[in-house]
């Protein structure tokens, strides 16, 4: 399911709260006992303050030998000598690909993705989409990428200043529906 809002900071705060990194202003939130989560945060800067190579960096976040780690990196288009590159010199897109490999390593049944296609090139987005198509768990995400939303989401939840809009439908239908347009205008207080 995709979460939408005109306020991107609200989306990030929401994901930080449900991931346990931030306390809500009011109320509580708890996952069910069978839920295991993997979070892909919007800001990944703190994860890359090291001189480790990609394989050693990824090994910090899960168990497995070098070949196992290279397999996860390979799914995100790192191959050959690239896996020995220092993480401190990675581009924004390469860092995001590493974070996706890290998230996949957790083998969670619920993925939380805060604008996951930021910094990714088309080839990386396609590889990520293909991985998500075969994923058997729940995916909660926000994105500005129309194609990504259309491909991954089957439920739309929009957070507005006056409540939520929650619809089981494809994104293209959501953005073209006259009923939804009227509802959004009302919920945002548009004239």
Q: Residues of each region from the PLM?
A:
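ABC ATP-binding cassette signature C-motif
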Residues: 1-191
């Amino acid at each position: 399911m995709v979460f939408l809002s005109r306020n991107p900071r609200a989306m990030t705060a929401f994901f930080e709260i449900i991931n346990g990194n931030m306390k809500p202003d009011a109320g509580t939130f708890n996952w069910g006992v069978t839920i295991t989560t993997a979070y892909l945060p919007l800001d990944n800067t703190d994860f890359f303050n090291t001189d480790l190579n990609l394989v050693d960096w990824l090994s910090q976040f899960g168990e497995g030998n070098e070949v196992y780690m290279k397999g996860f990196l390979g799914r995100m288009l790192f191959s050959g000598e690239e896996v020995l590159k220092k993480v401190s010199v990675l581009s924004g897109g390469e860092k995001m690909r590493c974070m996706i490999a890290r998230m996949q390593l957790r083998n969670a049944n619920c993925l939380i993705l805060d604008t996951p296609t930021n910094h990714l090139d088309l080839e990386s987005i396609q590889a990520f989409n293909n991985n998500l198509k075969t994923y058997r768990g729940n995916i909660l995400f926000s994105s500005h990428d129309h194609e990504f939303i259309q491909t991954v989401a089957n439920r739309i939840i929009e957070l507005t200043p006056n409540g939520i809009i929650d619809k089981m439908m494809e994104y293209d239908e959501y953005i073209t529906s006259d009923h939804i347009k009227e509802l959004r205008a009302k919920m945002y207080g548009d004239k």
